[in-house]
């Protein structure tokens, strides 16, 4: 595991204690992903890859109550919050799944792929899925946190958000990984916050504040820079509050 991934794992491990209280976006996207999963087959074994604290497990157990479910996450504190009876928990990396070839009927992964190399995740899915098995995933697209990027214009030259794969890259990852795309659907979700600190806290408490970029800010922002950043963001305020966009993609593919 490289240094960036270790830092990301640490960020999500720290977020575990707050995660369920602020994971509104994960619950929303998970429900949308399940609704989009028009799959007639009944999977015997389901992997929740990047399961977090286990919200997806609830959706899976309702949809496929007879399935054997494996919950996998690389942050052990997340796994410790999952009731023991809900699934077999494995601490592991979705870019290097510790599972046997062709051992899974359906791989579910909601809002985890964006922290990884999408092509590698698809290759791992192709490896563990049985013939005819499904990858059902959601991920973030390049429009995510667009407001943060706009607010930092003229403040500094650091990169403050991650680079997320666009629809073309996602489609290529599926096809190159020998999976047949069945659904690729974009859903733009916007959340609103009363003030900037609560907006930033929501990102931090989800563990999504780690930026994997060479030119990311490594120290604290100065008071002058903060004031300019806050003023820029305030100009985006609507009647609902300060907006923050989650540009999401729902992906369903078959081996």
Name what the model sees in each region.
Residues 1-17:
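N-terminal, positively charged/glycine-rich alpha-helical extensions of SAM-dependent methyltransferases
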Residues 53-55, 183-255:
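Conserved Class I S-adenosyl-L-methionine
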Residues 119-134:
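A short glycine-rich, Lys/Arg-flanked "PGG" loop and its adjoining helix->strand segment in the class I
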Residues 105-119:
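A short SAM/SAH-binding and catalytic strip from SAM-dependent methyltransferases
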Residues 95-107:
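A short acidic, Gly/Pro-enriched loop at the edge of an enzyme's catalytic core
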Residues 134-198, 206-218:
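Conserved catalytic/acceptor-binding region of the Class I
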Residues 24-43:
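Conserved alpha-helix/loop element of class I SAM-dependent methyltransferases that forms part
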Residues 45-97:
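Class I SAM-dependent methyltransferase SAM/SAH-binding core
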């Amino acid at each position: 595991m490289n240094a960036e991934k270790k830092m990301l794992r640490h960020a999500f491990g720290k977020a575990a204690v707050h995660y369920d209280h602020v994971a509104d976006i994960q619950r929303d996207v998970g429900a949308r992903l399940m609704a989009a999963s028009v799959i007639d087959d009944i999977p015997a074994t389901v992997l929740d890859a990047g399961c977090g604290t286990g919200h997806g497990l609830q959706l899976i157990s309702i949809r496929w109550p007879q399935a054997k479910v494996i919950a996998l996450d690389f942050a052990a504190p997340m796994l410790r919050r999952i009731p023991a009876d809900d699934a077999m928990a494995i601490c592991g990396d979705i870019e290097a799944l510790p599972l046997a070839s062709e051992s899974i009927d359906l791989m579910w992964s909601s809002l985890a792929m964006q922290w990884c190399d999408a092509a590698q995740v698809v290759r791992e899915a192709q490896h563990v899925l049985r013939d005819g098995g499904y990858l059902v995933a959601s991920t973030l697209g390049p429009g995510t946190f667009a407001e943060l990027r706009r607010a930092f214009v003229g403040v500094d030259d650091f990169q403050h958000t991650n680079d997320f794969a666009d629809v073309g890259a996602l489609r290529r990852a599926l096809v190159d990984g020998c999976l047949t795309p069945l659904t690729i659907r974009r859903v733009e979700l916007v959340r609103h916050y009363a003030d900037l600190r609560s907006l930033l806290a929501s990102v931090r408490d989800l563990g999504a504040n780690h930026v994997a970029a060479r030119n990311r800010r490594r120290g604290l922002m100065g008071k002058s820079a903060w004031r300019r950043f806050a003023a820029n963001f305030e100009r985006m305020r609507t009647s609902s509050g300060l907006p923050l966009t989650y540009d999401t993609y729902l992906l369903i593919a078959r081996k």
